[in-house]
């Protein structure tokens, strides 16, 4: 199983991943750090969808071969993610653009066709539907 960009409640606030970074910065009213022009894309898989894929994989015939990509084939630009986080948190944070690291990929999106064919799985939770409980978790953690 190859896991792509999972997010959700119980993430560590300092884990260095973009979802937690943006949410923490927005809730604290800090500038949101954007690298490059924000047009690079990623896909984000809500933790509940990941767990469902794991359960299906464990319940599948042992002849299953992989690796099987588990993620969300729907892409989102970093700019779209930041704007969604600002809107959903009600933050007044500003976006600050910094140079893009030379090794940062422009696109990262899994091909989940094997998961669909062999596990009958595909993600069900939209980015915004997954961000809501994730933001609520961080709001309790950071703001009390």
Regions found by a protein language model. Name each.
Residues 1-17:
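Flexible, glycine-rich beta-alpha linker
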């Amino acid at each position: 199983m190859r896991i792509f960009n999972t997010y959700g409640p119980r993430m560590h606030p300092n884990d260095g991943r973009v979802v937690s970074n943006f949410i923490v910065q927005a809730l604290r009213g800090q500038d949101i750090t954007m690298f490059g022009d924000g047009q690079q894309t990623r896909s984000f898989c809500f933790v509940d969808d990941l767990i469902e894929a794991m359960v299906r994989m464990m319940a599948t015939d042992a002849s299953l071969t992989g690796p099987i990509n588990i993620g969300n084939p729907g892409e989102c630009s970093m700019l779209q993610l930041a704007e969604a986080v600002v809107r959903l948190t009600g933050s007044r944070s500003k976006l600050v653009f910094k140079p893009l690291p030379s090794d940062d990929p422009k696109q990262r999106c899994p091909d989940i066709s094997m998961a669909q064919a062999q596990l009958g799985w595909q993600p069900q939770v939209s980015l915004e539907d997954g961000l809501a409980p994730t933001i609520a978790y961080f709001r309790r953690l950071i703001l009390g």
